[in-house]
């Protein structure tokens, strides 16, 4: 989503609160909880899950392995739920022609660098760069090339924009910032 006027362009960034992340975290939690319950029921000799009789699964080696995978899955699931609740990666890109400043803000993981805030002068922006990698895992990323700073990514690598969408976004931004476009 973006808000644009004659002098200011604000692009909101979604971050980790995407439907796919919610689905993966939920599925991973349920699956790993099932693995822990099956491993525990094989250890206790009681049916904690009515789908699988505990006598059919021996604790050594199947029960131990299932418990290990279940615990590992719970850790990964809790990591996903934490990134969703902290909304890691969300923020905004603000381009202000009136003040001549570009601000890039992202939320990170809790700690000293939770707030990631970059500020540049517009006259330091050399170009808008599109990097295209075709093949099995094709990706198109939009960068802002800044003097002395290198390239700052403006789109996420997992965004999967079509060539037309990335070109249109790059053209609009380059026109707004009055800088050239480079394609790599």
Curated annotation (Swiss-Prot):
Gene Ontology cellular-component terms listed: chloroplast thylakoid membrane; photosystem I
Location(s), subcellular: Plastid, Chloroplast thylakoid membrane
Pfam families, A to Z: Ycf4
Keyword terms: Chloroplast, Membrane, Photosynthesis, Plastid, Thylakoid, Transmembrane, Transmembrane helix
Family: Belongs to the Ycf4 family.
Protein name per its UniProtKB record: Photosystem I assembly protein Ycf4
Species in which this protein is naturally found: Eucalyptus globulus subsp. globulus (Tasmanian blue gum)
Secretion signal, residue range per the UniProt entry: none
Membrane protein topology class: Multi-pass membrane protein
Domain of life: Eukaryota
Residue ranges crossing the lipid bilayer per the database entry: 19-39, 57-77
Phosphoprotein among keywords: no
Keyword Transmembrane helix found: yes
């Amino acid at each position: 989503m973006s808000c644009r006027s004659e002098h200011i362009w604000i692009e909101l960034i979604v971050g980790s609160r995407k439907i796919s992340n919610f689905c993966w975290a939920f599925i991973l939690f349920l699956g790993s909880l099932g693995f822990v319950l099956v491993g525990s029921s094989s250890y206790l000799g009681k049916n904690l899950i009515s789908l699988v009789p505990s006598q059919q699964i021996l604790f050594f080696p199947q029960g131990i392995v299932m418990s290990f995978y279940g615990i590992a899955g719970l850790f990964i699931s809790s990591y996903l739920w934490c990134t969703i609740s902290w909304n890691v990666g969300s923020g905004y890109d603000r381009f202000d022609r009136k003040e001549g400043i570009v601000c890039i803000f992202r939320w990170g993981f809790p700690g000293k660098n939770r707030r990631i805030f970059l500020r540049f002068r517009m006259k330091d922006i050399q170009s808008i760069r599109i990097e295209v990698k075709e093949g099995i895992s094709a990706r198109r990323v939009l960068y802002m090339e800044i003097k002395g700073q290198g390239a700052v990514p403006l789109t996420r690598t997992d965004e999967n924009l079509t060539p037309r969408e990335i070109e249109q976004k790059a053209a609009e931004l380059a026109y707004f910032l009055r800088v050239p476009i480079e394609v790599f």
